[in-house]
Regions:
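N-terminal metal-binding scaffold of metallo-dependent hydrolase/deaminase domains
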Residues: 1-33
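Divalent metal-dependent hydrolysis catalytic cores, especially in the metallo-beta-lactamase
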Residues: 52-58, 70-99, 115-128, 157-169, ...
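Active-site mouth loops of central-metabolism enzymes
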Residues: 54-67, 135-143, 188
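Aromatic/hydrophobic pocket-lining residues that form the small-molecule binding cavity
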Residues: 69, 96, 146, 150, ...
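Short, electropositive alpha-helical surface patch
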Residues: 96-111, 175-186
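Conserved phosphate-binding/catalytic loop of the ribokinase/pfkB sugar-kinase fold
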Residues: 128-155
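Active-site core of metal-dependent hydrolases
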Residues: 151, 155-221
Length: 221
């Protein structure tokens, strides 16, 4: 549909508005009728920092095609997520970088994907392998971070934005984080029972870090 209008409640005010669009652009936003035929809401699309796949498309799977990425992206947009960081989780580092490189090549081929996929989120393999903290990640391929990994990651994704999630208590984490922030990579720290002292040490780095409390699950026999 190249043009049209919709009456709905504005997400910020809850008041009815009438929105008109043409050729993919909003051309008018004005107060709407007090009584709406359909009680619906209108809001900007969301931006998600972690999308591992959608609509039957698993980004962790090898051999994805341009059509696969477009399918997932269009379904996300239909459901309210307009832009996102494509996320890969723990795997052997070489396999992870190969997969990331292929996904970047596909993304760079399409203006639609370049608009939607703002960057990349690498979650692992530098996480805790302790039971209850590795979640869906394979603890057998967890490893300690090294500045070499950071160089390889930046080489694969070029100047694209990238978010790297790691556990700060892993050996070599401080050096890897210093290297990461020096090349513009945002680091997200996930906590484990031994992370507090590591976080205090890392806090001296004068660059943005994102802190997140790791979801903890009780082990039930």
């Amino acid at each position: 549909m190249s043009e049209g209008e919709i009456c709905a409640r504005h997400y910020a005010t809850a008041k009815p508005v009438r929105l008109r669009w043409k050729a993919g652009k909003i051309i008018q936003l004005e107060p709407g009728p007090e009584r709406l035929e359909i009680d619906q809401w209108i809001a900007p699309p969301l931006m998600d920092l972690q999308i591992n796949g959608y609509g039957g498309v698993d980004f962790q799977r090898d051999g994805l095609t341009l059509e696969d990425l477009l399918s997932a992206t269009r379904q996300l947009r239909r459901d309210g997520c307009g832009q996102y960081l494509l996320t890969l989780i723990t795997d052997e580092w070489s396999a992870l970088m190969k997969r990331l490189g292929q996904l970047k090549r596909l993304r760079d081929e399409s203006p639609e994907l370049r608009h939607a996929i703002l960057g990349w989120h690498v979650e692992g393999p530098f996480l805790s392998a302790q039971p209850g903290f590795c979640g869906a990640h394979n603890p057998a391929v967890m490893e300690d971070p090294h500045p070499r990994h950071i160089r390889e990651l930046r080489a694969v994704i070029g100047n694209d934005p990238v978010l790297l999630t790691l556990a700060p208590e892993r050996a070599g984490a401080l050096e890897a984080i210093e290297r990461a922030v020096s090349v513009g990579i945002i680091v997200r720290l996930v906590s484990t029972p031994r992370a507090a002292s590591s976080v205090m040490t890392i806090s001296r780095i004068k660059n943005p870090l994102v802190m997140r409390r790791w979801n903890q699950y009780l082990r039930r026999e």
